[in-house]
Amino acid sequence: MLKLPPRFFSVYSTLIHILASFLCSSDVRGDFPATRFDLGTLTLSSLKLLGDAHLNNGTIKLTRELSVPTSTAGKALYGKPVKFRHPETKSPASFTTYFSFSVTNLNPSSIGGGLAFVISPDEDYLGSTGGFLGLTEETGSGSGFVAVEFDTLMDVQFKDVNGNHVGLDLNAVVSAAVADLGNVDIDLKSGNAVNSWITYDGSGRVLTVYVSYSNLKPKSPILSVPLDLDRYVSDSMFVGFSGSTQGSTEIHSVDWWSFSSSFEESSESPPPMPNSPPPSSPSSSITPSLSTVRRKTADPSSSCRNKLCKKSPAAVAGVVTAGAFFLALFAGVIIWVYSKKIKYTRKSESLASEIMKSPREFTYKELKLATDCFSSSRVIGNGAFGTVYKGILQDSGEIIAIKRCSHISQGNTEFLSELSLIGTLRHRNLLRLQGYCREKGEILLIYDLMPNGSLDKALYESPTTLPWPHRRKILLGVASALAYLHQECENQIIHRDVKTSNIMLDANFNPKLGDFGLARQTEHDKSPDATAAAGTMGYLAPEYLLTGRATEKTDVFSYGAVVLEVCTGRRPITRPEPEPGLRPGLRSSLVDWVWGLYREGKLLTAVDERLSEFNPEEMSRVMMVGLACSQPDPVTRPTMRSVVQILVGEADVPEVPIAKPSSSMSFSTSELLLTLQDSVSDCNEVLAPISTTSCSSSEHDIFIVGKDRSV
């Protein structure tokens, strides 16, 4: 029996739906499909860039990076118009947008400007610089607009409350409503990534704005404004961002953006129009057109807007007959074409079942040219699964990072795991996978190249000391990424290899967590299966080493190790220099050392001595988070969502016992770590070591068989 693809039934049912709607539908609110997109799916051709706006490694830059203070403006708009008002009912659409942005500065004393989310009727209009934010002209002329501004300079001309506020602008840059961002501890000029959610309820006529450092939406909005949006928009508008500088060196970046809008009917319908049908039943929200058919049949007295319904019964019968014939003919053609396709299509290995939304597929020739035939001079790192090269694409000149998997059998598993996971993930602090190549028996993964390399290189190899604000921003970003993987994805994702060499840094030192080769998906609230433990010593939780079961709390332990490493500038496990003629000494645990200082009331003496400036209270809070995440008992460790809330000041610092708790296992955590590490070191002459993703790291990745499992 021929098995038809699900797509056939989808198309077939859609045609029936269209025919039924054509005959008798009077519901005009469903004429326009929802608009949905995000920055990860947009290309250069799908954006309209004006002025100084440009794309840089997947980030929208509204202003350029200039060392000399200037006044410039830029605007980036989604290239297609979006329906914001129904042409017949004039009712406004509901919409939701989320974006992550930052305001950085080459000269902290040179401030002035800002950016705004804008709804504009004109895709080619760019307003004046300075406080006008590219929204309108100095003369006051310009196209009408609706905008939510984030302003970094107090301008008396525009009645600004201060130089750190959010405001709603309606056809003018004098805000109709404004809120002080200091009330929620947000500083636009800090350089930190700021997240904003803007929603508009078309039925309730209310616009709300939420702002937070965390990627978790706050409970309360900073702005909630009654707004008749239909008074300020036309039927179709353009959405995007506008920004400007005002004699400053500010750089306005949008790292992530998602948008959706629709004309969905609310649960509380507005008063019915004359001669309109009564409010629909609950089922109408699922199948509105069919519900409309039932309503019209049940109520013959209701008027019909469709001209076809006013024709004679014979005309209606003719249309129905023709429609039925067309559907039958369509079904027959599809069945014939699909049967021929099955007969002549060879069975071949495909990644379609593994990857639902694949990134771009590169050719081997492209990558060979990009790396100068994989020249050793292009090598920028060696990982547990292969070598990483710097590449330059010949067609666009774009600089990329190419990961060349070293072992085909092992690399194939790595390839499928990494591609199927990263290909569908969207978060500003996750390393973006541009594409892949699977030719000539090789597997290659293509990523955005991070100008500042990995975090471990920034900590240990850079000639300049990584300042504390950058370190704090990095820790917050990684925590945000892990909270997303653990609690915001459809299936929970356990990374299993969180370490400083897997954290990459972009041009603004924003962190990008990468290397998903060891990651695993599980359903939320479901116990994971035991597997062979894998990862890097010093970052592995003790219970994971014994049971082989990776949970979100094992990632939390790894994150705790990263926190302490970043704060102290020391690796999780270190070995003292051996005395001449003697066997090297045992390695020491960073967690034990920091906990000992905490017990003595000298926690801040553990801080990296290269750090000349930092906030002691802030440093103490972060280090306490590191200790809380490093507790031997996984039950007592916080979740990553809690960690984010603690770091941004939305939750209190957890209580950490003065003395490190004893492990519930038969031996202490440090004893377990040190013994295993020494065992790995002793085998180096027999077994080939597996290096970390950083060339400079002295630790070794391990692959340890779980309890009661054999090699």
Swiss-Prot record:
Keywords: ATP-binding, Cell membrane, Glycoprotein, Kinase, Lectin, Membrane, Nucleotide-binding, Plant defense, Receptor, Serine/threonine-protein kinase, Signal, Transferase, Transmembrane, Transmembrane helix. The active site is at 497 (proton acceptor). Residues 337-711 are cytoplasmic. Residues 374-656 form the Protein kinase domain. One of its GO terms (cellular component) is plasma membrane. Gene3D superfamilies: 2.60.120.200, Phosphorylase Kinase, domain 1, Transferase(Phosphotransferase) domain 1. Its EC number is 2.7.11.1. SUPFAM superfamilies: Concanavalin A-like lectins/glucanases, Protein kinase-like (PK-like). Disruption phenotype: Increased susceptibility to the oomycetes Phytophthora brassicae and Phytophthora capsici. It is found in: Cell membrane. Glycans are attached at residue 57. Residues 282-291 have a biased composition (Low complexity). PROSITE patterns: LECTIN_LEGUME_BETA (PS00307), PROTEIN_KINASE_ATP (PS00107), PROTEIN_KINASE_DOM (PS50011), PROTEIN_KINASE_ST (PS00108). The chain crosses the membrane at residues 316-336. Residues 269-281 have a biased composition (Pro residues). One of its GO terms (biological process) is defense response to oomycetes. Residues 31-315 are extracellular. Residues 265-306 are annotated as: Disordered. One of its GO terms (molecular function) is carbohydrate binding. It comes from the Eukaryota. Involved in resistance response to the pathogenic oomycetes Phytophthora infestans and Phytophthora capsici. In the C-terminal section; belongs to the protein kinase superfamily. Ser/Thr protein kinase family. This is L-type lectin-domain containing receptor kinase VIII.2. The lineage of its organism: Eukaryota, Viridiplantae, Streptophyta, Embryophyta, Tracheophyta. The gene is LECRK82.
